[in-house]
């Protein structure tokens, strides 16, 4: 069983080219199943049936595993058995028809509008770190980017003249997002300072040594801003949740918000497939508290 698990993980790495993070998560889940099988004297993957797998899921749920974690584990099992069936090592999938126990969905933490404005409207020092961090905060809240999307952002993805940014989201899917006026202003003040570092690549956000900022560095800068301005813990995804919450509260247009967030769930995607970007931009411009244009501002 261990050899077959190793072979499957190598298949994921070399042929499917899954990310190291995903591979590590799948391996942890499958090793959990393997360990349980060994304790139950199940000597092969072919001997694991739906009743025994259901017992494992129930046991893990009783031990406090979340519904989301169990769904991921079942997904890993299905992937393994798809591989085993293809290789002629098994003729069934014990995860077929199994679903994780339903659990309470935790509501995402958000800032209310007043707290978001408090975070963003404080005085900004005219120096490298302050201008860069302000641009990061504004862009997170303006456009609802994921941390990975902001970290990977390059100069050619920004169009400040038209107030647009193209991001590379999950599954290597691109989407076009509006950039609010306040975020554009913050970026325009940051980019000349960025150029002074003679950056090593086209990253929008770089260190004082000109190197692209990694996820951890950005998390720490956002956390520091939250502690300084709000006296609370703050992380990038809280700004993304706040973006979505405030936009939905103002617009009541769930489909537009889902499109702007880049959610890939087919059940939600099908609802707003036919919405064009102009509609999304109109919803964004009229509803987002940091994007509303001043009268006469056509830029």
From Swiss-Prot:
<keyword id="KW-0229">DNA integration</keyword>
<feature type="active site">
    <location>
        <position position="170"/>
    </location>
</feature>
<feature type="active site" description="O-(3'-phospho-DNA)-tyrosine intermediate">
    <location>
        <position position="272"/>
    </location>
</feature>
<dbReference type="GO" id="GO:0003677">
    <property type="term" value="F:DNA binding"/>
</dbReference>
<keyword id="KW-0963">Cytoplasm</keyword>
<dbReference type="GO" id="GO:0007059">
    <property type="term" value="P:chromosome segregation"/>
</dbReference>
<keyword id="KW-0132">Cell division</keyword>
<dbReference type="InterPro" id="IPR011931">
    <property type="entry name" value="Recomb_XerC"/>
</dbReference>
<feature type="domain" description="Tyr recombinase">
    <location>
        <begin position="106"/>
        <end position="285"/>
    </location>
</feature>
<dbReference type="InterPro" id="IPR011010">
    <property type="entry name" value="DNA_brk_join_enz"/>
</dbReference>
<comment type="subunit">
    <text>Forms a cyclic heterotetrameric complex composed of two molecules of XerC and two molecules of XerD.</text>
</comment>
<dbReference type="InterPro" id="IPR023009">
    <property type="entry name" value="Tyrosine_recombinase_XerC/XerD"/>
</dbReference>
<dbReference type="Pfam" id="PF00589">
    <property type="entry name" value="Phage_integrase"/>
</dbReference>
<keyword id="KW-0159">Chromosome partition</keyword>
<dbReference type="InterPro" id="IPR013762">
    <property type="entry name" value="Integrase-like_cat_sf"/>
</dbReference>
<protein>
    <recommendedName>
        <fullName>Tyrosine recombinase XerC</fullName>
    </recommendedName>
</protein>
<comment type="similarity">
    <text>Belongs to the 'phage' integrase family. XerC subfamily.</text>
</comment>
<feature type="active site">
    <location>
        <position position="263"/>
    </location>
</feature>
<feature type="active site">
    <location>
        <position position="237"/>
    </location>
</feature>
<keyword id="KW-0238">DNA-binding</keyword>
<feature type="domain" description="Core-binding (CB)">
    <location>
        <begin position="1"/>
        <end position="85"/>
    </location>
</feature>
<feature type="active site">
    <location>
        <position position="146"/>
    </location>
</feature>
<dbReference type="InterPro" id="IPR004107">
    <property type="entry name" value="Integrase_SAM-like_N"/>
</dbReference>
<comment type="function">
    <text>Site-specific tyrosine recombinase, which acts by catalyzing the cutting and rejoining of the recombining DNA molecules. The XerC-XerD complex is essential to convert dimers of the bacterial chromosome into monomers to permit their segregation at cell division. It also contributes to the segregational stability of plasmids.</text>
</comment>
<dbReference type="Pfam" id="PF02899">
    <property type="entry name" value="Phage_int_SAM_1"/>
</dbReference>
<dbReference type="GO" id="GO:0005737">
    <property type="term" value="C:cytoplasm"/>
</dbReference>
<keyword id="KW-0233">DNA recombination</keyword>
<dbReference type="InterPro" id="IPR050090">
    <property type="entry name" value="Tyrosine_recombinase_XerCD"/>
</dbReference>
<keyword id="KW-0131">Cell cycle</keyword>
<dbReference type="GO" id="GO:0051301">
    <property type="term" value="P:cell division"/>
</dbReference>
<dbReference type="GO" id="GO:0006313">
    <property type="term" value="P:DNA transposition"/>
</dbReference>
<dbReference type="InterPro" id="IPR002104">
    <property type="entry name" value="Integrase_catalytic"/>
</dbReference>
<dbReference type="InterPro" id="IPR044068">
    <property type="entry name" value="CB"/>
</dbReference>
<feature type="active site">
    <location>
        <position position="240"/>
    </location>
</feature>
<dbReference type="GO" id="GO:0009037">
    <property type="term" value="F:tyrosine-based site-specific recombinase activity"/>
</dbReference>
<dbReference type="InterPro" id="IPR010998">
    <property type="entry name" value="Integrase_recombinase_N"/>
</dbReference>
């Amino acid at each position: 069983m261990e050899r077959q698990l190793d072979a499957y993980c190598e298949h994921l790495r070399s042929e499917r080219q899954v990310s190291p993070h995903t591979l590590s998560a799948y391996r942890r889940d499958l090793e959990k199943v393997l360990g349980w099988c060994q304790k139950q004297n199940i000597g092969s993957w072919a001997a694991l049936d739906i009743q025994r797998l259901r017992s494992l899921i129930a046991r893990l749920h009783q031990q406090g595993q979340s519904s989301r974690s169990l769904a991921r584990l079942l997904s890993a099992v299905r992937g393994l058995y798809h591989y085993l069936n293809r290789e002629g090592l098994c003729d069934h999938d014990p995860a077929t028809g199994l679903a994780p126990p339903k659990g309470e969905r935790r509501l995402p933490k958000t800032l209310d509008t007043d707290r978001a404005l408090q975070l963003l409207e404080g005085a900004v020092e005219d120096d490298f770190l302050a201008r860069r961090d302000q641009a990061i905060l504004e862009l997170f809240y303006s456009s609802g980017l994921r941390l990975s999307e902001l970290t990977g952002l390059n100069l050619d993805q920004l169009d400040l003249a038209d107030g647009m940014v193209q991001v590379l989201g999950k599954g290597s899917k691109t989407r076009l997002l509006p950039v609010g006026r306040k975020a554009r202003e913050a970026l325009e003040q940051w980019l000349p300072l960025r150029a002074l570092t003679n950056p090593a690549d086209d990253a929008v956000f770089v260190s004082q040594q000109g190197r692209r900022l990694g996820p951890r560095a950005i998390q720490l800068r956002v956390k520091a801003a939250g502690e300084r301005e709000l006296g609370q813990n703050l992380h990038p995804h809280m700004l993304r949740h706040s973006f979505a919450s405030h936009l939905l509260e103002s617009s009541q247009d769930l489909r537009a918000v889902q499109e702007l967030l880049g959610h890939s769930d087919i059940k939600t995607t099908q609802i707003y497939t036919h919405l064009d970007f102009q509609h999304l931009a109109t919803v964004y411009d009229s509803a987002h508290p940091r994007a509303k244009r001043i009268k006469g501002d056509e830029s």
